[in-house]
Amino acid sequence: MGAAISQGALIAIVCNGLVGFLLLLLWVILCWACHSRSADVDSLSESSPNSSPGPCPEKAPPPQKPSHEGSYLLQP
């Protein structure tokens, strides 16, 4: 019985493994959710650029401005 592991050590090893596995699973789910959300926003912006930005305002396209608006400042 030289390889006997105490019950407390066995419980600690199992719990640490479960916590690590759950953290890894949570990280994968978050990455998948963010990736699929950004892909949905990209497909929406390609199909209809005038549509509402949707659930991700940080990915919204910038408002369209006339290109000659800033040229007045450059001319003397």
Curated annotation (Swiss-Prot):
An annotated Gene Ontology molecular function: hormone activity
Signal peptide, first to last residue: 1-33
GO cellular component terms attached to this protein's record: extracellular region; plasma membrane
Cell location: Secreted
Annotated region described as Disordered, given as residue ranges: 41-76
Any GO BP: positive regulation of Notch signaling pathway
Triggers of expression: In liver, up-regulated in mice fed a high-fat diet for 2 days, and down-regulated in obese mice fed a chronic high fat diet. Also down-regulated in liver 4 hours after treatment with LXR agonist GW3965.
Signal listed as a keyword: yes
Keyword set, alphabetical order: Secreted, Signal
Transmembrane segments: none
Entry keyword Secreted: yes
Chief localization: secreted
Its biological purpose: Involved in the regulation of glucose homeostasis and lipid metabolism.
Name of the protein in its database record: Adropin
Provenance organism: Mus musculus
Organism taxonomic ancestry: Eukaryota, Metazoa, Chordata, Craniata, Vertebrata
